[in-house]
């Protein structure tokens, strides 16, 4: 058995996961990070992701609050990047809506299981969002955590990653209007680097390790866990599965 920290970034539909039509100006989905705190959380995470694919697929496999409430047990949630629901509202100047969204997620996952996520990749909009998140954390008593959005391992991987991004999206490096990750800060940063970015949020820095320490998922390897199907009397496996 090996202890792991298993997580997934899910896409949360603005309303129901079954809705395939959007009203004017509405986002298709919001990002949300889910971590399995224990084996029950791992089971619930698999159910959330699976039903997002089978029931909520619209551009992305989307989930909704109904699913999150049904399978919240054993899961720690982070508010994600600038594409998270709380952050989206802040960027639009809708701070009251951002507060409502944060409380909605805290009510869903439980106090101490939902964290407002601070990131700093040198983007101007992150400075504004982080300032507001700090105020919201104090006002609403919702804990914070610092993270770095990672898309490549080392700092000098930025150029190869940009080339791969062009291959993926069918663009050229010389194209101005294309997807790119500006600033070269999307790599795995050291503890010292992260502390240097957030000298004003020591509690949030320490929460990064506290969350990791809480995650205890144990997966047993080397054991086949396929479901067993009994063959009806009078059949063998080959005969029963033949067309």
Task: Identify what each model region corresponds to.
Residues 3, 7-242:
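Phosphodiester-processing cores and adjacent nucleic acid-binding clamps
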């Amino acid at each position: 058995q090996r202890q792991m920290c298993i997580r997934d970034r899910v896409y949360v539909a603005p309303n129901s996961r079954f809705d395939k039509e959007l009203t004017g100006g509405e986002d298709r989905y919001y990002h949300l990070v889910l971590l399995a705190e224990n084996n029950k959380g791992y089971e619930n995470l698999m159910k959330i992701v699976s039903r997002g694919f089978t029931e909520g697929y619209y551009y992305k496999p989307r989930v909704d609050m109904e699913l999150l409430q049904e399978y919240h047990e054993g899961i720690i949630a982070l508010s994600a990047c600038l594409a998270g629901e709380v952050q989206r509202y802040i960027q639009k100047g809708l701070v009251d809506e951002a507060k409502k969204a944060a409380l909605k997620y805290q009510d869903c996952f439980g106090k101490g299981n939902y964290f407002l996520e601070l990131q700093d990749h040198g983007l101007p909009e992150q400075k504004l969002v982080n300032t507001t998140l700090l105020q919201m954390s104090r006002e609403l008593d919702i804990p914070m955590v610092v993270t770095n959005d990672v898309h490549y391992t080392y700092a000098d991987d930025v150029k190869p990653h940009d080339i791969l991004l062009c291959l993926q999206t069918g663009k050229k490096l010389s194209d101005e209007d294309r997807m790119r990750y500006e600033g070269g800060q999307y790599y795995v940063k050291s503890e010292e680097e992260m502390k240097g970015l957030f000298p004003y949020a020591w509690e949030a820095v320490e929460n990064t390790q506290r969350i990791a320490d809480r995650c205890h998922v144990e997966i047993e390897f080397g054991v086949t866990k396929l479901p067993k199907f009994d063959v009806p009397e009078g059949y063998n496996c080959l005969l029963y599965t033949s067309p």
